[in-house]
Design a protein with these regions (language model features):
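Oxidoreductase and adenylate-handling cofactor-binding alpha/beta cores
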Residues: 87-106, 155-159, 284-298
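An N-terminal-biased, well-structured beta-alpha scaffold segment characteristic
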Residues: 1-78, 211-213, 234
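Phosphate-binding beta-alpha-beta segment of Rossmann-like dinucleotide-binding domains, i.e.
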Residues: 79-137
Length: 306
């Protein structure tokens, strides 16, 4: 009998994939496996019984990989399980940045006492006019599960799409639309694209990859979208550039004091995978990974301290 412990609420449709050989434990102590979403595990005392940690999500920044490796604990994640949910939010982010939809909605709310609001709206709507994304250039940095979906969807929306990923997998390459133009130098995306969306993991080599130097290469009307990891962008440099009118908008799914309320910043409260479908898919995949490891020794989608 295996014991598993959930550090966060895990979708029941996922837990239903455990059979009678698995029992949920109310305590971490004595657990053979742990399921986690966003709970911070750094500094947590890991029991000697623990064999596996499965993150119901793609990133593993909240898991102490070095400590797990030292104790022989295998860490799994669920890449691609929430990809469609994130893709849809990225597309929404592009539209929110292109047309002042949010500003228009707030104006309507503020004028709710106007008995002739329809006529007033006709006079005021010019204040919320924007641009269309069709025909614009989109640069996708990172062509993993999410990046490929974003690139393909943008093609169908009439955009001219450029993709950069020196480490693209065979699977991703097969799934990528032939209409996406391959870029070998990321600086070409910074210089040429109207929209730039980042979909790379957070590593020492990618931390603050979108820095002041990169921002200085961008067009004055550039819109940067970050639904991957907050530390991929030097947000202080980004806010300075927005204030100076050097680029148009920054859309992020990671609220913090630097960006919230700053000119040109559109910030959502980490909604990327916050859909019922994404949570279900991640939970199902995480449970199946644990079972496959416990029962068969399979090590698909593991993460390590490197």
């Amino acid at each position: 009998m295996f014991q598993y412990h959930c550090l966060n609420p895990i979708a029941g449709v996922g837990l239903a994939n455990f059979n009678e050989n698995y029992q949920q434990s109310e305590s971490l102590e004595g657990a053979d496996a742990v399921l986690v979403r966003s709970a911070a595990m750094h500094g947590m005392e890991l029991p000697k019984s623990l064999l596996a940690v499965a993150r119901a999500g793609a990133g593993v920044n909240n898991i102490p990989l070095a400590d797990c490796a030292e104790q022989g604990i295998v860490v799994f994640n669920t890449p691609g399980a929430n990809a469609n949910g994130v893709k849809e939010l990225v597309l929404a982010g592009m539209l929110l940045a292109s047309r002042d939809i949010a500003g228009g909605i707030e104006w309507v709310k503020s004028d709710k006492e106007d008995g002739d609001i329809a006529k007033t709206a006709e006079k005021q709507k010019k204040n919320f006019a924007g641009t269309e994304i069709s025909g614009k250039k989109l640069g996708v940095i990172g062509l993993g599960a999410i990046g490929v979906l974003v690139a393909n969807a943008a093609i169908h929306m009439g955009m001219d799409v450029y993709g950069y990923d020196p480490y693209i997998s065979v699977s991703a390459a097969w799934n990528l639309s032939r209409s996406v133009k391959h870029i070998s130098n990321v600086e070409d995306i910074y210089r040429e694209c109207d929209y730039i969306t980042i979909h790379v993991p957070l590593l020492d080599s990618t931390k603050k990859m979108v820095n002041a130097e990169a921002i200085a290469m961008m067009k004055p009307n550039a819109i940067v979208l970050n639904f991957a990891r907050d530390l991929l962008v030097d947000e202080e440099a980004m806010v300075e550039a927005l204030a100076a009118g050097k680029i148009k908008k920054y859309v992020s799914d990671f609220p913090n004091p630097t960006t919230v309320g700053a000119k040109g910043c559109i910030v959502t409260p980490h909604l990327g995978a916050s859909t019922a479908e994404s949570e279900d898919n991640c939970a199902i995949m995480a449970v199946r990974e644990i079972r496959d490891y416990m029962e068969n020794g399979c090590l698909l989608y593991t993460s390590d301290a490197a």
